[in-house]
Regions:
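Histidine-/acidic-rich catalytic cores in large beta-rich domains
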Residues: 23-414
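Generic detector of low-complexity/intrinsically disordered segments
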Residues: 12-18, 81, 333
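Bacterial Sec-dependent N-terminal signal peptides
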Residues: 1, 8, 14-36
Length: 414
């Protein structure tokens, strides 16, 4: 871990203060007439993959602040209330280089000095995609861990070659201590190899994961492809979007690491088995409507509902979907366990095969990031498009809403 010293000087030199730059516009409105009821005191924090930067912009596309990370972004950014920013960056010589790989986490202070930097990348694992900063000061993130062909076979994997199963890691970034960990391979069921302990009927085990659901369509080892996580600290639950399963999984975070490797313990009594799952009941041979086809950003709303971006919902057309989630969660074999869809938005012009997400704004509107096109949408509850803005950034991971009363703005000198 690096803390201040030379590293902070280099970061300070490579980062550019937005308030010292000329007010550049970074895109244009697609239709100026579609700006009727937007809150003009709202700003947008854009994770710009195409330029490996982050930008704070307004509705007119004026850039108020810019972070140039002197490295490749990979993928998420978090702006904290004190003006500091946490960013995921790509590690050199990462063991797994699938889309969204990272391996480095950096916290940059409001004055652009480096607070800390940690690496979670080795010949056997690589952090990727997403990170959250918890109220206890820890970070929680996604990571691939490599299993050899022999190790995969021992778990009943029907394919051949290396596989990259998913883990979730909570780390103290100041000490680099791993304080909690969850591993999907502890929660597998498979009906391929009856000599293995995890052999069973997939449909009878809705809280476990069918290891072989994607093997026939994936030859690169990336079987699951987690790409987003959200932590509900009040209820100690983790929500993850599982792209290649077209699902959202819900995992108990109240467990110890030992309990997380089992099927007992924790507030919800399931250990690390899935507390809930939805979006594609075909993954566990169950009944119910399939509502997701590739999915990004599990965004928990204040109401307890969840917003997601369904990338491939229609033929070359995406959809944003809001699910009503009602606890206590229950997964019953042979029963429709899918939640109710309470809101959705789609448009024939909106399509991104990857990346992307949606945020519910204070005025009730929804901000949508069409990631692979670099386009931002603001839509009302009834589907009216209030703002449609094509940025100059060709690839956006996500866009976060920042309000004018956010103390981060003052900390940044804005």
């Amino acid at each position: 871990m690096k803390k201040f010293w030379i590293g902070s000087i280099l970061i300070a030199m490579s980062l550019m203060w937005g308030c010292d730059r000329e007010a550049d516009e970074v895109g244009e409105a697609v239709d100026d007439e579609q700006e009727g009821s937007t809150d003009r005191e709202t700003y947008f924090l854009v994770a710009d993959q195409s330029n490996n930067e982050a930008h704070l912009i307004d509705y007119d596309g004026v850039e108020l602040f810019n972070w140039d990370f002197n490295g490749s972004i990979g993928n998420d950014i978090n702006l904290l209330s004190d003006g500091s920013l946490i960013v995921c960056l790509k590690a050199n010589n990462a063991a797994v280089t699938e889309g969204g790989y990272g391996g480095i986490f950096r916290k940059i202070n409001a004055d652009q000095t480096l607070d800390w930097e940690v690496t979670y990348s080795s010949p056997s694992y690589t952090a990727h995609h997403d990170v959250e900063y918890l109220s206890n000061g820890n970070i929680i993130f996604l990571a691939w861990e490599i299993r050899s062909n022999d190790e995969a076979a021992e778990e009943g994997y029907a394919g051949r070659g290396l596989i990259y199963p998913e883990t979730i890691v909570e780390m103290n970034p100041l000490t680099e201590e791993i304080v909690w960990k969850w591993d999907v391979m502890d929660h597998i069921v498979q009906d391929y190899d009856d000599t293995r302990a995890n052999y069973g009927v997939v449909a009878d085990n809705p809280n476990k994961v069918d290891l072989n659901y994607t093997y026939s369509s994936r030859d690169d080892g990336d079987l699951f492809h987690f790409n987003g996580l959200t932590v509900d600290e009040e209820h100690d639950l983790i929500y993850v979007t599982v792209n290649f399963y077209s699902e959202v999984w819900v995992i108990d975070h109240s467990t110890t690491t030992e309990e997380a490797s089992s099927d007992t313990g924790g507030i919800y009594g399931k250990g690390g088995d899935l507390v809930y799952r939805f979006g594609n009941p075909e993954t566990y041979d169950n009944v119910g409507d399939v509502t997701l086809d590739r999915v990004h950003y599990p965004n928990m709303l204040e109401s307890g509902n969840l917003l997601v971006y369904a990338n491939e919902k229609y033929d070359s057309q995406s959809e944003v979907i809001e699910f009503a989630l009602n606890s206590p969660y229950s997964l019953v074999a042979g029963q429709d366990n899918e939640p109710e869809v309470v809101w959705s938005f789609t448009d024939s012009r909106m399509y991104s095969s990857g990346l992307s997400g949606a945020e519910r704004m204070d005025n009730g509107h929804t901000l949508i990031t069409e990631g692979r096109d670099g386009t931002l949408w603001e839509v009302t509850e009834d589907g009216t498009i209030e703002w449609l803005f094509k940025t100059d950034y060709s690839t956006i991971w996500r866009t976060y809403v920042v309000y004018s009363d956010d103390p981060a703005l003052e900390a940044l000198g804005l």
